[in-house]
Swiss-Prot record:
It comes from the Eukaryota. Residues 263-311 form the FBD domain. This is Probable FBD-associated F-box protein At5g38565. The lineage of its organism: Eukaryota, Viridiplantae, Streptophyta, Embryophyta, Tracheophyta. InterPro entries: F-box-like_dom_sf, F-box_AtFBL13-like, F-box_dom, FBD, FBL13/AtMIF1-like, LRR_dom_sf. Residues 1-47 form the F-box domain. It comes from Arabidopsis thaliana (Mouse-ear cress).
Length: 349
């Protein structure tokens, strides 16, 4: 024990981070110095089975006349927590079973969903939540879910090919949305309008997501992942009149060297964002195929207020076709700086 007492607090906290949460908290009875050390831990894991969880709670310092429970622990101990950031891992199903009598004042929450109803149950006890990540992975039986959180500002939603999946509803005034919906079967996606949305990351497998298009009209920064046969980009540009920054990525293995940007569907009329607001354009995984060239040239010759355009190619310069044509292509903005960066560090302007 004398060996540990001679170590600085940050080293002791590092040591505590390698042991289970219940063990770390139990060290608070060792001495006055150890009483609050566990409160500097950046991660607390309460994902234990019920029996282990209750055993853990009994190691905490409570008034023995008061009811011992996880909610009591969170109410009394977490407000004293001193770490600048806390990741709390908890068995939500256990919380639902024991019955909630209080609210969780958590602002950041990540959850892997197995049941749609349980998600809304969790959200209903988080009234000040502003950052939420929801993951629906393969083999998880999530049929549908709804997200209604008035305080929510940032949402990350990842949906894989779940075995049974009908769709989802999002009704919250977001400022940031990251949507990775790669579920290949038909499903509904109902996103209510988000007038405060400023940035969106969109990676979707299906094109028929009309509510998605209508919900991002106020976005100023758009990050979009190209997928083979997807034709949603033209519609995204058309319905984002305030767009200032456009970042385009391409899924390696989906958009190949032979296909290029085959999913670019040129709009009938020039989108308003190109004529009025777009200032920064970035494209990664440029292959130099004719489809790639046509897409970039379209942006350059129609973006009247473009300041910078950066094109990133994976291959060395001598393996990327049409670079000269791209460099000499007309630009609607006389102040636009075009930068083309190829593999192995070569660059041309």
């Amino acid at each position: 024990m004398d060996i540990f007492n001679g170590l600085p607090d940050d080293v002791l906290v590092k040591i505590l981070s390698f042991v289970p949460t219940k063990v770390a908290v139990s060290t608070s009875i060792l001495s006055k110095r150890w009483e609050f050390l566990w409160m500097w831990l950046p991660r607390l894991d309460f994902g234990s089975p019920k029996t282990d969880l209750l055993a853990f709670l009994n190691t905490c310092q409570y008034d023995k006349e008061e009811e011992v429970g996880l909610v009591d622990f969170i109410d009394k101990k977490l407000p004293l927590h001193r770490a600048p950031f806390l990741a709390m891992y908890v068995c939500w199903k256990f919380l639902m079973n024991v019955g909630m009598k209080t609210y969780f004042h958590v602002r950041h929450l990540e959850t892997r969903q197995r049941e749609g109803k349980s998600l809304q149950d969790i959200l209903s006890i988080c009234p000040v939540l502003d950052d939420l990540s929801v993951i629906c992975s393969v083999h998880q039986d999530v049929k549908e879910f709804t997200i209604i959180v008035p305080s929510l500002q940032s949402l990350t939603l990842f949906i894989e090919n779940c075995e049974v999946f009908d769709g989802y509803v999002i009704d919250t005034p977001l400022k940031y949305l990251k949507l990775e919906d790669v579920h290949e079967e038909e499903h509904y996606c109902l996103l209510k309008k988000m007038p405060k949305l400023r940035e969106a990351y969109v990676d979707v497998q299906l094109d028929d997501l009309k509510s998605l298009i209508g919900s991002i009209t106020s976005v100023k920064r758009l990050n979009h992942m190209f997928r083979e046969k997807s034709k949603i980009l033209g519609q995204l540009l058309k319905d984002s009149p305030n767009l200032r920054v456009l970042n385009i990525f391409k899924v390696q293995g989906h958009v190949t060297l032979s296909t290029g940007v085959d999913c670019w569907n040129q709009p009938i009329s020039v989108p308003e964002c190109l004529l009025e607001s777009l200032q920064i354009f970035n494209l990664s995984h440029y292959f130099g195929k004719q489809q790639d060239l046509d897409f970039v040239v379209y942006i350059l010759k129609n973006a009247c207020h473009l300041k910078t355009a950066t094109i990133l190619a994976d291959e060395p310069e001598h393996l990327v076709p049409n670079l000269k044509e791209l460099t000499l292509s007309p630009r609607a903005s006389s102040t636009c700086q075009l930068s083309i960066r190829c593999g192995l560090g070569s660059e041309r302007s």
